[in-house]
């Protein structure tokens, strides 16, 4: 699992992890490093303490983040995959209008900083960290969970590179997505989201068991949700499909407040219903951006209103 392929060309995490660099910058990672059957350094990705240590080492080594922590039972995301989403979203940004360091290398003269809204920022605050460090974007991160907001705020406060660049907002109505977060006179160049996959706690547990069984090559009978995330990070009523249908409906109201609306879509079977909803709200353009991280295939749904 130390190797990944076909990540975005600007992703710093292409190839194998450089454990010499990572352990030098974050020595506590050393005790988790082992050799796989091919003699390649890796960690046990089923050990949440090892994954957390790896994340800390990656954030220190590649993003200059000196403090990062998450509460117990909260989602510890794979950074290479999160970075891929950010880099593909950067390709959507119009270099004639906003600052984007990926385009500045080509001699473009940006006019202002990009503003990005992260729906469901989580306690880990990963997307704003990567987006700001890589591209200088300004972020607003929203979440329905007060603990997530406070933890993300602590990460921002403890890292000078992030100070005054990331604004955290609590969504007080868990039935809403943009309502109560976007002010009437506010504008975002893009919104991003990694929605809850499942429709119930039971479905989330079954999905985690299937994933672990597939990865380990053997049947796993028991698991704990705290390995893969807090309840609101993993499931919501109606699951991913209902969440995204609601997001598309609300996006029409905020068509003048946002350039691009985007979200990850975990289940490809949901796409046809999402396409139908996009047509029903009369979007001007929509597209699917496909990503590949090793053996995992994922996709971004992006849409916009041009009025």
UniProtKB/Swiss-Prot annotation:
Stated role: Specifically methylates the adenine in position 1618 of 23S rRNA.
E.C. numbers: 2.1.1.181
Protein name: Ribosomal RNA large subunit methyltransferase F
Primary enzyme class: transferase
Entry-linked Pfam families: Methyltransf_10
GO molecular function, one term: 23S rRNA (adenine(1618)-N(6))-methyltransferase activity
Keyword list, A-Z: Cytoplasm, Methyltransferase, rRNA processing, S-adenosyl-L-methionine, Transferase
SUPFAM superfamilies, sorted: S-adenosyl-L-methionine-dependent methyltransferases
GO terms, biological process: rRNA base methylation
Entry's family note: Belongs to the methyltransferase superfamily. METTL16/RlmF family.
Location in or out of the cell: Cytoplasm
UniProt xrefs under CDD domains: AdoMet_MTases (cd02440)
Enzymatic reactions: adenosine(1618) in 23S rRNA + S-adenosyl-L-methionine = N(6)-methyladenosine(1618) in 23S rRNA + S-adenosyl-L-homocysteine + H(+)
A Gene Ontology term for the protein's cellular component: cytoplasm
Chief location category: cytoplasm
């Amino acid at each position: 699992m130390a190797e990944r392929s076909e990540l975005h060309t600007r992703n710093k995490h292409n190839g194998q992890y450089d454990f010499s660099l990572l352990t030098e910058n974050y020595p506590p990672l050393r005790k988790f490093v082992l050799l796989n059957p091919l003699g390649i350094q890796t960690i046990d990705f089923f050990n949440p303490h090892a994954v957390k240590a790896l994340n800390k080492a990656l954030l220190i080594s590649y993003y200059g983040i000196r403090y990062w922590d998450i509460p117990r039972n909260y989602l510890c995301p794979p950074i290479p995959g999160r970075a891929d989403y950010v880099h593909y979203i950067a390709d959507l940004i119009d270099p004639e209008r906003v600052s984007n360091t990926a385009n500045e290398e080509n001699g473009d003269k940006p006019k202002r900083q990009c503003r990005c809204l992260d729906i469901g920022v989580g306690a880990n605050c990963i997307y704003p960290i990567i987006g700001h460090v890589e591209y200088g974007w300004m972020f607003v991160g929203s979440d329905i969970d007060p603990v997530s907001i406070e933890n993300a705020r602590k990460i921002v406060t403890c890292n000078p590179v992030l100070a005054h660049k990331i604004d955290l907002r609590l969504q007080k109505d868990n039935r809403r997505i943009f309502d109560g977060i976007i002010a009437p006179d506010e504008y975002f160049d893009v919104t991003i989201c990694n929605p809850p996959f499942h429709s119930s706690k039971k479905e989330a547990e079954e999905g985690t068991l299937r994933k672990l069984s597939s990865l380990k090559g053997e049947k796993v009978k028991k698991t704990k949700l705290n390995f893969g995330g807090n309840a609101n990070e993993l499931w919501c009523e109606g699951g991913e499909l209902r969440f995204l249908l609601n997001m598309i409906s609300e996006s029409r109201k905020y068509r003048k407040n946002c350039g691009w609306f985007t979200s990850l879509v975990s289940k490809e079977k949901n796409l046809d219903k999402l396409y139908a909803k996009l047509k029903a709200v009369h979007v001007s353009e929509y597209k699917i951006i496909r990503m590949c991280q090793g053996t995992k295939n994922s996709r971004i749904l992006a849409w916009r209103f041009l009025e």
